[in-house]
UniProtKB/Swiss-Prot annotation:
This is UPF0235 protein Ppha_2415. It comes from the Bacteria. Signal peptide: none annotated. PANTHER family: UPF0235 PROTEIN C15ORF40 (PTHR13420:SF7). Belongs to the UPF0235 family. One of its GO terms (cellular component) is cytoplasm. Pfam families: DUF167. It comes from Pelodictyon phaeoclathratiforme (strain DSM 5477 / BU-1).
Length: 97
């Protein structure tokens, strides 16, 4: 199960990113968080932007409402989805874990 927290009315969870994959997608669970494959290389913040875009499409919100709180230069990232409660996020992320 995905470990979700709530911070100021926004869902927060951990993501393990794998850059330079053949396509961008959510793969499933990884140590209480989500594992994602990202097509972009980790150069000039491209993989971080792609990670935010992936979750914005998944939650059907603008990319500006998805933030990486920590791990900008790491494969393990803490992601916040602004304006989505942890309960609503759990429903969206349920198929992945």
């Amino acid at each position: 199960m995905i470990e979700l927290r709530e911070k100021n009315g926004s869902a927060v969870f951990v993501v393990k990113a794998q850059p330079r994959s053949s396509k961008s997608r959510v793969c499933g669970l990884y140590n209480g968080g989500l594992k994602v494959n990202l097509k972009a290389a980790p150069v000039d913040d491209a993989a971080n932007r792609e990670c935010c875009e992936l979750f914005s499409k998944l939650f059907r919100i603008p990319p500006s409402r998805v933030h990486i709180l920590s791990g900008q230069s790491s494969r393990t990232k803490t992601v916040m989805v602004e304006g989505i409660s942890s309960k609503a996020a759990a429903l969206v992320l349920e198929p992945f874990g």
